[in-house]
Amino acid sequence: MSLDVPGKGMDINLRLYLVRHGETDWNVESRIQGKTDIELNEKGRQQAEGLADVLKKGYGIRRIYTSRQKRAAETAEIIGQRLGIRPEVREGLEEINFGKWEGHTWRQVRELFPQEYFVWHGNRRYEVPPEGESYQQLLDRLLPALDNIMRRDRQDVLSITHSAVIMTLMSYLNDTPFEDMARNYKTGNTQIVELDQDLFYQRYKRN
């Protein structure tokens, strides 16, 4: 498929799949992880192994990229071992930085940071949690990373990343409220989401 973007004439035939990492103990405890570097739990490792089997049978993955964070990198490593592919760390795929809110549940955040949460909740795309980053700042690093991947590769690609990354991207591409992202695009551990490249470039070049 040819896209009228910088470097037009470039054919992009690959499929790009985004996958959320496997389960962690903080997922089970409903604690906000963000940039905090939490490892997979045993169930998370089993989920990664199960996904690897699915990918090996039904997908033509030729390259694997991953966030640098342990929960993503370990998921990628397990899958890569099954597929015979060495994962590459790609900057920009990291989870959103929730700053001082990390380690807490959302209920605790509302109790401990009532004013900050109120302001953030009403304008999630642009408001920044204490010592964290906004969803727009996440987009500012994510979109160029995905663009670079699609310009570099000509074969099917797997990118291991995080829930807020996927939900933020889907909200941006579909032009839906960022406040509704969890309702609209909730992503389970090791869930596969295929990136619509036409939609990506329609939005990316326009903005």
For the regions a language model picked out, list residue spans one by one.
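Active-site-proximal alpha-helix that buttresses catalytic centers in soluble enzyme cores
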Residues: 3, 14, 23-89
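Short beta-strand scaffold positions
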Residues: 66-67, 140, 160-161
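Domain-level recognition of soluble alpha/beta enzyme cores
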Residues: 176-202
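Extreme N-terminal starter segment of soluble prokaryotic enzymes
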Residues: 11-17
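Glycine-rich phosphate-binding loop signature in dinucleotide/nucleotide-binding domains
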Residues: 57-60, 149-156
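Generic beta-sheet signal
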Residues: 16, 153-164
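Phosphate-handling substructures
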Residues: 81-141, 204
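Short active-site segment of divalent metal-dependent hydrolases/proteases
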Residues: 24, 165-166
